[in-house]
Amino acid sequence: MSVLPSSVVASLDDILLRHRHQATELLQILIQAQQIEGWLPAATLTHIAAALGLPRARVEGVAGFYSFLYTQPVGRYRVLFSDNIIDRMLGYVELLDALCRKLWIEPGHVSEDGLVSVTTTSCTGLCDQGPAMLVNGRAIGQLSHRRINEIAELIRQQRALDLWPADYLQIDDHIRRR
């Protein structure tokens, strides 16, 4: 078992204190804890479990259930393609393959330089705007080969998401009242 650096322990204890060491706050605690190192190492899960008085298996189960929580190292750009039936019918598999080829990465892996990881999630909540993906938690819908080419270039340039074309991050509200 690895030992956590004292700065990480201090940050975790701060998060736990803000949530009053309440086990009912586990998901929020994990989300905030992940921001410390960009993922949730085993030692972090153990520390949280002990502090909340929960079995480690329960904490690990919650961390493993949500696709936006990472129990393995991920790239600085974390790309999650939606893998639901709608996105499959709209051709997401070809787009995922195209992005991976352009970034020289295999799906489910982290690039050698740690820049990017690409994988899938069961749903992004955007099947009305698919194919869709999340990049560092930001939704991008209506993917096309042109957009994938440009996204690959933006990632290679290490451009901050706030500087990406605004229309890429624009999600239309298709909910209508009668």
Language model features: what each stretch is:
Residues 1-178:
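Feature of Fe-S/electron-transfer and energy-metabolism proteins
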